[in-house]
Amino acid sequence: MRLVIARCSVDYAGRLTAHLPSAPRLILVKADGSVSIHADDRAYKPLNWMSPPCTLKEGSGDEEGVWTVINKAGEKLIITMEEILHDSSHELGVDPGLIKDGVEAHLQELLADRIETLGDGYTLIRREYMTAIGPVDILCRDATGQTVAVEIKRRGEIDGVEQLTRYLELLNRDPHLAPVRGVFAAQEIKPQARVLATDRGIGCTVLDYNAMRGIEDDKLRLF
């Protein structure tokens, strides 16, 4: 991971246009190719970002100090450096990922055992389907034979949707699985997470943990 603290301005050109005026900011360049720009007041959420796959070109000569980030859709993030205050790179290695709490692990087990609760005709491929960036909670197929990746959380928030999005981007590169769609499943799904999931074509499923643990009439509310 590369960490750059710099006074910079940022311009985005794509489906929309956006401009961030000059200010001190943190720029993260991760090993997966993503680039994100952060202020000191927004918790984990960046001011702007470019998800992988994308390329970063650092200008030289007349363009020195200008970074251009381009994704596969041709969208551009142009970062104009005025003063670099810090620039360092660190090898973090492979992250072991989040260790699920007991409820999430049990939800995964229950849903895998009763995969048909997602819909008639669903069949399980496997739990903990391993990818290069971590395990997908459940990989299954729907009644039409399409591959479905399911991310399970006790509380569904934006970071869970982002995690599933990364899995989907990777899984859809595999011709043996593609096309792959996503389902975000949780006991409670925050409104912002639902909006983001819907915008990305990801389905949302609210899980009734108590019902799944043994009440005869299993109840899932599908949205």
Curated annotation (Swiss-Prot):
Going by the UniProt record, its keywords in alphabetical order are: Cytoplasm, DNA-binding, Endonuclease, Hydrolase, Nuclease
Cross-referenced Pfam families, in alphabetical order?
NucS_C, NucS_N
According to its UniProt record, where is this protein mainly located?
Answer: cytoplasm
Q: EC number(s) for this protein?
A: 3.1.-.-
Cite the GO molecular-function annotations of the record: DNA binding; single-stranded DNA endodeoxyribonuclease activity
Q: Which InterPro entries match?
A: Endonuclease_NucS (IPR002793), NucS_C (IPR048301), NucS_N (IPR048302), NucS_N_sf (IPR049173), tRNA_endonuc-like_dom_sf (IPR011856)
Q: Which CDD domains match?
A: NucS-like
Instruction: Write out the GO cellular component annotations.
Output: cytoplasm
Q: Which Gene3D superfamilies match?
A: 2.70.180.20, 3.40.1350.10
Asked if the Swiss-Prot or TrEMBL record annotates the protein with the keyword Nucleotide-binding, the reply is: no
Among its keywords, does the record have DNA-binding?
yes
Compartment(s) where it occurs, according to its Swiss-Prot or TrEMBL record = Cytoplasm
| UniProt enzyme class | hydrolase
What the protein does comes down to: Cleaves both 3' and 5' ssDNA extremities of branched DNA structures.
Q: Which HAMAP family does the record cross-reference, listed alphabetically?
A: NucS
Which NCBIfam families would you find in this protein's record? PRK03298.1
What family does the Swiss-Prot or TrEMBL record give for this protein? Belongs to the NucS endonuclease family.
Q: What is this protein called?
A: Endonuclease NucS
Organism encoding this protein: Streptomyces avermitilis (strain ATCC 31267 / DSM 46492 / JCM 5070 / NBRC 14893 / NCIMB 12804 / NRRL 8165 / MA-4680)
